[in-house]
């Protein structure tokens, strides 16, 4: 039984939540998000909170209710506060710059990499070695950050590569003679 599903999601001021059959829409100051709710979960909106209850007899209903609660909570936080993910470029000559809605990356390859940002994600480069991604959809921000990191993941010997701001790269010792 999921304990996550038992905690209701509170709706902050300025956020509007509507439920149309199995489609939940959350609108706020930063934007709006829509999600289709699993059939094994009943959603109840009352008194400024959203409650998640499993459907009787459905297999894995408590697990689905907990997952749905976590996803809806991320939607509410996203439209009210937004999410951001920071990336650092570590290495000689590694640079990033913003060109329109694209990020131009120089990561030690023979050619520059151009990463197109999807709709709903904005980027900022406070310095040549820092990238800040912002948006309302937590999953989309994480996906874009993982794609950019995937071009040159941090390697364990010198630590060069693209890493998350809070990432600790496990270093290895060089081979002994």
UniProtKB/Swiss-Prot annotation:
UniProt entry tagged with the keyword Ribosomal protein: yes
Biased segments, Basic and acidic residues type: 152-171
Parts of the chain that traverse the membrane: none
GO CC aspect terms: cytosolic large ribosomal subunit
Pfam families xref list: Ribosomal_L6 (PF00347)
Keyword annotations: Ribonucleoprotein, Ribosomal protein, RNA-binding, rRNA-binding
Residues covered by region (Disordered): 152-177
BP term (GO), one: cytoplasmic translation
Highest taxon, organism lineage: Bacteria
Gene Ontology MF term list: rRNA binding; structural constituent of ribosome
Function: This protein binds to the 23S rRNA, and is important in its secondary structure. It is located near the subunit interface in the base of the L7/L12 stalk, and near the tRNA binding site of the peptidyltransferase center.
Family statement drawn from the similarity comment of this UniProt entry: Belongs to the universal ribosomal protein uL6 family.
NCBIfam families per UniProt: L6_bact
Quaternary organization: Part of the 50S ribosomal subunit.
Name the record gives this protein: Large ribosomal subunit protein uL6
Species for this entry: Shewanella sp. (strain ANA-3)
Originating gene: rplF
């Amino acid at each position: 039984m999921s304990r996550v599903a038992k905690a209701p999601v509170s709706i902050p001021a300025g956020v509007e939540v509507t439920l149309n059959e199995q489609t939940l829409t959350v609108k706020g100051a930063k934007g709006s998000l829509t999600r289709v709710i699993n059939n094994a979960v009943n959603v109840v909106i009352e008194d400024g909170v959203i409650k998640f209850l499993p459907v009787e007899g459905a297999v894995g209903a408590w697990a689905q209710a907990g997952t749905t609660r976590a996803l809806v909570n991320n939607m509410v936080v996203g439209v009210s506060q937004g999410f951001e993910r920071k990336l650092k470029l570590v290495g000689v000559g590694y640079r990033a710059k913003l060109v329109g809605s694209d990020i131009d990356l120089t990561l030690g390859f023979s050619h520059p990499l151009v990463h197109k940002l999807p709709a709903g994600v904005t980027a900022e480069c406070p310095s040549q070695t820092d990238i800040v991604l912002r948006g309302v959809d937590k999953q989309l921000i994480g996906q874009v950050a993982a794609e950019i990191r995937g071009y040159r993941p941090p390697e364990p010997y010198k630590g060069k590569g693209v890493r998350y701001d809070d990432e600790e790269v496990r270093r290895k010792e060089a081979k002994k003679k």
